């Protein structure tokens, strides 16, 4: 890289060139060991036929002679010499690869000023493997040199400069090992200081030490094969001290290069970047007298190049020994020659390898303290050619060194390929002591005559010394030969062309003639052919006309044949007269191209033209555009006050006598102010003089010092208030606050209607009594419901460890409709607290006494714990959301007397007097308020915890307050105060978990009940695929027979007159057909029949519907149809999609709505716990449900199906199912459910659960038939719901749903009846044509939990809800104000307080509601809280 800088210093223009040279040498192999050399001139003795290749590349920048006459310039030579070392002691290591990378950046020399760039510092960074010192020698020497030489007086610069220099890169570079002579004497004024540091490896015994010395520097291992000044073998370096330790870049100037002693006299500090003037290069002693101090920067002044002494004086014309500033156009040869290093290695050059290090080369030549001549302008490389030098490649960049003042010599390059004899290389001119350019590069280039007497190029040669006259002559001759060759070639070519043209013309003529002849011949033939005729003589012949004709034809043909054969042609007649010229013929086709002539021989290459001499510097360019205005400089120092001393004050004139006032003269120009005279008596005021002309503006004074800062301005007035920002987006609901303090118990709500009595669950052993939860404020006494039978108090079971969540319990409705498996609250129930409310409700006890108004609700029974434990019990969730978990009580079963240990399920919730419901109690409490549970949209029930040990059947709690109360308050439905709500499902009293599990199961069952499922199905997200579908089991437990179903469907289709040809019927067609409303109804009514109790849960699809494989069903139907010859019409277009299920927001809104506020309202005080039922919660619930089945179910269903709850449960609406015919939103959901989900197995369950799969549990797959999404209702549901579950799913979306659906025997009639019944009960099917309500079948086993639409996960709804809540927190409805308590039922006897379930996700802490008033206040408080929280 060549960068030229121009600086003006001291009025002298100085041009510097920075030459950055990157040299990478790579040692790829070592020559054979056999190559030894005696080290003398004849290196031909190298063993092994070794070959020496030298490639020298010299970059020389043209010197510039400034006004002081010194040449400024620098040159570096990096030469790559591939040669075998003559006498290397390094062993042969062919496998080794040795790389050397050198990066040199040299700056031009500097004038003697100490300005910032005056120091000719060549930044040099090198990594040498030789030992390093703390601070590199080069740096130290460099600083020393700069300090001493920078200023003309050679005085040391200030300490700060020293510090600055030292601070630059103290140990940034590693210096080679110090030679014994490496101490740099402080250069004296007038001496030349040269310092070249060569990075080299300390190679001993063939080991290349390539340690990177400074990790801060880029990793770069630079090893040179040349011993770094250290004796290579046992040779000692017996040098006298060499001044300034010139480390020659190629050969150590005073070091023995190849281990031979160098008994040289100390060299003067001459700078020899190339071969140092005093070095023995190949072990030859260089017994040269020290060369003069002339900076022969590159001339190999006295080196023994190849073992040959070079006593080459420097041409005197170039350098006068004493003054180095005179035109020292010595050629600079820096032969970074590995030949001078260990030539035993073959070095390969890598040009493109960026150097990792920069070699800072400081070259300083100080002359009389003023001028530094870094390197002569002219650079020539001496080519050492010995007999052993087989090939030499030199590229010399030589600048014209003519001494041209103020002219920058440009870089001229001439590449010379060839061999130079040693005679040419060695100039034996005995002129000067200092080595001159071997070929007079300095002489000829510099205009000196000392460039060698012969062998030098003429002065006009631009390359100075790179070529000789005979080369030029040879070049000219070659050029002339080339030109002559070209000329002859052209002449020959022209002749060829001429011949070709003549030939072409001849061919053309021949062709034309041929055509003419042919034409003439043909015309003649025609004429001849016409000539024959029948002569008159023939006519007289005996031949008749016919024979004559035949003869004529024969003869004619014969003649024609002969003529064609040319036999009849006579001699040409005389040439006829030339006819008139015919029309010009068409242009002939171009002739075929002739064969290309042979290529001419390439002419001789012309001689290379001479390189033009350096042109004169061009005229000075026009002044460049004005540069952009620079940034304002720092404020200048205030200038000195303006010049000009104030004049002395004039002497006051004497006061003259007062003259008479003169006539006012015209105002003269204002005279200069005279020095005031003594004040005379005031004269009369003269007329005002004319105003003097404005003087020229004075020179602008220097800018005054900046004034002190002005006082701070007064603070601006406050700006007007900004416009009120638009209200921010509503913030996410805040974390659910902790439940507010319980509000005072509201007045008891009117007794809720007693729900149908649930079947009496087995009396659970009384669980340990849960710690009583804080009682809610007593609700207003509700009407006392009939007291549920008091369950035996279960002995409180010790809290069992949380069991695995049990399967969802089934709620047995009195009607026997399929139990809905409501997933119990997820999570194993928490450890059993003190006995919760009575254990599983035994048979409903007599109605509890009306709860006290808003007595504080006991902590939810253990079951609650379970829920809570599950962490996501629905009630918790709801409570957390501020929705009273106790939703509207499901129709409370008569509340059993509280089991002693396990709190009976709270009776029907009293009016929710409580403030925010505590964490949901054990599910029992939920269940107790089964509606309550649902009232808040139940959180997804956690997976039922493992059933805890069965508590002893709780002693029937005192009858809970009539469920009515609870109902009334919790749900919109009036809770019947009478019998306490269904006893909370007591878990097995023994453990919380049991109770929780039972409750969970109860809830699961309940949720799986048709009504709830229907409700949920709409609400829930698509049921997750239940476990693998179990065989579709009919309610009776028979495996569902697809064939039967198919036959029934086909029969129905036949009777209905559908006419789709079997050939065209596909599963899709059938599915579509099955989706038709009438078919759905048929399936629902006839096939499904009244929904039976939910089938046993399928394994995933244990519910009959769950495992219904709709695809299979459709295939069966097709098969059946094919066998029956029934054909269907194409399915009609799908009905409009059912309305979307309630969305989560809608649910929340609904739950918060006034209608459901009651449902959600704080549950009334728990009714007296029912007698502890058998531990199974479901049984207790069942009992309760059985006793209050109607109310209970209706309430539960109502609650669950209430938009609020549905919205809640649904959470975000599941993906809409395929469009079903519009149906009730539930149906629609179901449909979509069914269809979408039915395609998904999981949906079934959920749908079954959520969808209201008919079978409730049956729907294992969720889709079981009824369940399927639409579950049976799918069908019911709608056109969509396809076959039931198939509904949407079945055909709806996937045929395979079908498969999902019917894999086992399914009692379709029962299923349909149940489904329809449950749907009708819920009012879902009111729009449907059929209202068949079969007696509810026995509840089937719970189906596997379906995915709740809300949560879209495959799990129990409870689990889903719980998960959902865990994930998202309770779904905070904006906490509604506490719902008005239903008419508080009389407070039932307080069930044993269950242990307080782990608090549900804290709902937003409601503000304490006003006491009473149906607990509104509590909700109200909550709402207020939420309001406060809301953005």
Curated annotation (Swiss-Prot):
Residues covered by region (Nonhelical region (NC1)): 1418-1431
Residues carrying a glycan: 1230, 1356
Stretches with biased composition (Pro residues): 823-844, 889-911, 937-946, 979-989, 1162-1174, 1212-1221
Ranges annotated as spanning the membrane: 469-489
Stretches the record annotates as Disordered: 25-155, 167-188, 304-324, 422-449, 564-869, 884-996, 1158-1178, 1208-1249, 1366-1431
Subcellular localization(s) per the UniProt record: Cell junction, Hemidesmosome; Membrane
Composition-biased stretches (Polar residues): 75-96, 111-120, 170-184, 1232-1249
Chain positions covered by the region annotation Triple-helical region: 570-1417
Modified sites of kind Phosphoserine: 547
Extracellular side: 490-1431
Ranges where the record places region Nonhelical region (NC16): 1-569
InterPro entries: Collagen (IPR008160), Collagen_superfamily (IPR050149)
One matching Pfam family: Collagen
Composition-biased stretches (Basic residues): 1421-1431
Oligomer status and interactors: Homotrimers of alpha 1(XVII)chains. Interacts (via cytoplasmic region) with ITGB4 (via cytoplasmic region). Interacts (via cytoplasmic region) with DST (via N-terminus). Interacts (via N-terminus) with PLEC. Interacts (via cytoplasmic region) with DSP.
The protein, known as: Collagen alpha-1(XVII) chain
Species of provenance: Mesocricetus auratus
Lineage of source species: Eukaryota, Metazoa, Chordata, Craniata, Vertebrata
């Amino acid at each position: 890289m060549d960068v030229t800088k121009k600086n003006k210093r001291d009025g002298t223009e100085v041009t510097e060139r920075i030459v950055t040279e990157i040299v990478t040498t790579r040692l790829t192999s070592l020559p054979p060991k056999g190559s030894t050399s005696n080290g003398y001139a004849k290196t031909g003795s190298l063993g092994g036929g070794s070959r020496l290749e030298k490639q020298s590349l010299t970059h020389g920048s043209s010197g510039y002679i400034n006004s002081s006459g010194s040449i400024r310039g620098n040159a570096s030579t990096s030469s790559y010499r591939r040669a075998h070392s003559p006498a290397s002691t390094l062993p042969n290591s062919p496998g080794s690869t040795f790389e050397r990378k050198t990066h040199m950046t040299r700056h031009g020399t500097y004038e003697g000023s100490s300005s910032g760039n005056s120091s000719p510092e060549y930044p040099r960074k090198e990594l040498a493997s030789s030992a390093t010192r703390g601070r590199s020698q080069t740096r130290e020497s460099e600083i020393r040199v700069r300090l001493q030489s920078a200023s003309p007086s050679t005085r040391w610069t200030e300490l700060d400069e020293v510090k600055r220099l030292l601070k630059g890169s103290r140990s940034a570079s590693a210096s080679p090992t110090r030679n014994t002579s490496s101490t740099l004497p402080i250069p004296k004024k007038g001496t030349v200081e040269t310092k070249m540091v060569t990075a080299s490896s300390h190679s001993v015994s063939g080991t290349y030490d390539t340690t990177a010395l400074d990790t801060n520097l880029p990793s770069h291992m630079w090893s040179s094969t040349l011993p770094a000044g250290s004796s290579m073998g046992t040779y000692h370096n017996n040098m006298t001290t060499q001044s300034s330790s010139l480390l020659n870049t190629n050969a150590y100037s005073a070091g023995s290069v190849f281990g031979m002693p160098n008994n040289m006299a100390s060299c003067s500090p001459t700078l020899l970047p190339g071969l140092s003037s005093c070095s023995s290069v190949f072990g030859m002693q260089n017994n040269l007298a020290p060369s003069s101090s002339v900076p022969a920067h590159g001339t190999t002044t006295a080196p023994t190049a190849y073992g040959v002494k070079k006593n080459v004086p420097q041409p005197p014309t170039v350098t006068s020994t004493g003054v180095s500033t005179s035109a020292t156009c010595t050629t600079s040869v820096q032969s970074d020659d590995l030949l001078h290093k260990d030539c035993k290695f073959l070095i390969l050059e890598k040009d493109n390898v960026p150097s990792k290090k920069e070699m800072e080369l400081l070259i300083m030549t100080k002359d009389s303290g003023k001028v530094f001549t870094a390197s002569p302008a002219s650079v020539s490389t001496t080519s050492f050619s010995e007999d052993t030098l087989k090939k030499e490649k030199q590229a010399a960049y030589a600048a014209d060194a003519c001494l041209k003042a103020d002219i920058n010599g440009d870089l001229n390059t001439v590449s010379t390929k060839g061999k130079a004899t040693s005679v040419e290389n060695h100039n034996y001119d005995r002129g000067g002591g200092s080595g001159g350019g071997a070929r007079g590069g300095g002489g000829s280039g510099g205009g000196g005559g000392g460039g060698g007497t012969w062998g030098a190029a003429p002065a006009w040669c631009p390359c100075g010394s790179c070529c000789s006259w005979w080369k030029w002559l040879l070049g000219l001759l070659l050029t002339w030969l080339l030109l002559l060759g070209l000329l002859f070639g052209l002449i020959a070519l022209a002749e060829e062309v001429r011949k070709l043209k003549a030939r072409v013309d001849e061919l053309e003529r021949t062709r034309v003639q041929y055509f003419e002849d042919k034409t003439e011949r043909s015309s003649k033939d025609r004429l001849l052919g016409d000539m024959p005729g029948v002569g008159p003589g023939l006519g007289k012949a005996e031949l008749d006309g016919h024979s004559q004709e035949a003869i004529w034809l024969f003869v004619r043909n014969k003649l024609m044949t002969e003529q064609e054969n040319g036999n009849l042609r006579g001699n040409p007649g005389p040439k006829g007269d030339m006819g008139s010229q015919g029309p010009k013929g068409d242009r002939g086709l171009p002739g075929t191209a002739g064969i290309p002539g042979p290529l001419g021989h390439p002419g001789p290459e012309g001689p290379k033209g001479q390189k033009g001499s350096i042109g004169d510097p061009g005229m000075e360019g026009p002044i460049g555009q004005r540069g952009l205005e620079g940034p304002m400089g720092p404020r200048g120092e205030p200038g000195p006050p303006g010049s000009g001393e104030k004049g002395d004050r004039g002497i006051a004139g004497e006061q003259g006598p007062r003259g008479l006032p003169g006539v006012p003269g015209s105002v003269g120009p204002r005279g200069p102010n005279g020095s005031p005279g003594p004040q005379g008596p005031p004269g009369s005021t003269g007329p005002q003089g004319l105003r003097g002309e404005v003087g020229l503006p004075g020179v602008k004074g220097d800018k005054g010092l900046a004034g002190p800062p002005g006082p701070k301005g007064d603070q601006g007035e406050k700006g007007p208030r900004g416009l009120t920002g638009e209200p921010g987006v509503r913030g996410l609901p805040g974390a659910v606050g902790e439940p507010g303090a319980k509000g005072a118990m509201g007045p008891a709500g009117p007794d809720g209607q007693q729900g149908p009595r649930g079947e009496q669950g087995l009396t659970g052993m009384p669980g340990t009594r849960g710690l009583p939860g804080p009682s809610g404020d007593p609700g207003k006494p509700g009407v006392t419901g009939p007291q549920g039978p008091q369950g035996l108090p279960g002995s409180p079971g010790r809290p069992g460890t949380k069991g695995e969540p049990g399967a969802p319990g089934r709620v047995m409705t009195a009607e026997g409709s399929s139990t809905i498996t409501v997933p119990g609250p997820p999570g194993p129930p928490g450890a059993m607290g003190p006995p919760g409310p009575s254990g599983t409700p035994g048979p409903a006890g007599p109605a509890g006494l009306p709860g006290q108004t808003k007595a504080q609700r006991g902590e939810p029974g253990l079951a609650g714990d379970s829920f809570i434990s599950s962490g996501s019990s629905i009630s918790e969730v709801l409570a957390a959301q501020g929705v009273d978990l106790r939703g509207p009580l499901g129709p409370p079963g008569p509340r059993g007397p509280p089991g002693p240990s396990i709190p009976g399920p709270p009776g029907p919730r009293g009016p929710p007097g409580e403030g925010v419901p505590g964490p949901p109690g054990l599910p029992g409490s939920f269940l107790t308020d089964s509606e309550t549970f649902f009232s808040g949209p139940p959180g997804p029930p956690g997976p039922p915890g493992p059933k805890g040990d069965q508590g002893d059947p709780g002693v029937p709690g005192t009858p809970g307050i009539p469920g009515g109360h609870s109902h009334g308050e919790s749900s919109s439905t009036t809770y019947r105060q009478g019998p306490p709500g269904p006893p909370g499902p007591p878990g097995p009293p023994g453990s919380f978990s049991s109770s929780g599990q039972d409750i969970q199961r109860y809830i699961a069952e309940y949720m799986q009940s048709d009504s709830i499922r229907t409700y949920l199905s709409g609400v829930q997200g698509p049921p997750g695929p239940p476990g693998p579908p179990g065989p579709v089991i009919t309610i009776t437990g028979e495996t569902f027979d697809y064939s039967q179903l198919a036959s029934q469907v086909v029969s129905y289709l036949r009777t209905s007159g559908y006419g789709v040809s079997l050939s065209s019927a596909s599963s899709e067609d059938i599915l579509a057909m099955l989706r038709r409303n009438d078919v759905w109804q048929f399936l629902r009514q006839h096939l499904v029949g009244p929904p039976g109790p939910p089938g046993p849960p399928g394994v995933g699809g244990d519910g009959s519907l769950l495992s219904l494989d709709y695809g299979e069903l459709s295939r069966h139907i097709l098969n059946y149809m094919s066998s029956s010859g029934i054909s269907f019409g194409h399915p009609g277009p799908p009905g409009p999609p059912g309305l979307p299920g309630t969305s989560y927001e809608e649910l929340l809104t609904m739950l918060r709505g006034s209608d459901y506020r009651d449902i959600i309202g704080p549950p009334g005080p728990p009714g007296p716990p029912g007698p502890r039922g058998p531990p199974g919660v479901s049984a207790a619930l069942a009992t309760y449900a059985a006793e209050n089945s109607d109310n209970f179910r209706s309430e539960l269903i109502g609650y669950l199906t209430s938009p609020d709850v549905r919205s809640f449960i649904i959470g975000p609406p599941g993906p809409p199912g395929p469009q079903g015919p519009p149906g009730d939103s539930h149906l629609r959901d179901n449909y979509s459910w069914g269809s979408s989900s039915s395609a998904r197995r999981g949906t079934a369950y959920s749908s079954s659960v959520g969808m209201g799969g008919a079978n409730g549990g049956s729907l294992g797959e969720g889709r079981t038939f009824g369940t399927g999404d639409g579950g049976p209702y799918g069908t019911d549901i709608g056109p969509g719901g396809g076959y039931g579950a198939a509904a949407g799913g079945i055909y709806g979306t996937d045929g395979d749903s079908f498969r999902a659906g019917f894999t086992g025997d399914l009692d379709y009639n029962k299923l349909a009846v149940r489904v329809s019944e449950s749907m009708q009960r819920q009012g879902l099917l009111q729009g449907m044509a059929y209202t068949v309500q079969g007696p509810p079948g026995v509840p089937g086993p719970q189906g596997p939990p379906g995915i709740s639409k809300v949560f879209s996960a495959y799990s129990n709804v409870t689990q889903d809800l719980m998960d959902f809540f865990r994930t998202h927190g309770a779904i905070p409805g904006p906490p509604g104000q506490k719902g008005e308590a239903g008419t508080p039922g009389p407070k039932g006897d307080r069930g044993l307080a269950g242990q307080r379930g782990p608090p549900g996700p804290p709902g937003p802490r409601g503000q304490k509601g006003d006491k009473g008033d149906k607990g509104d206040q509590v909700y109200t408080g909550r709402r207020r809280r939420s309001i406060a929280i809301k953005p």
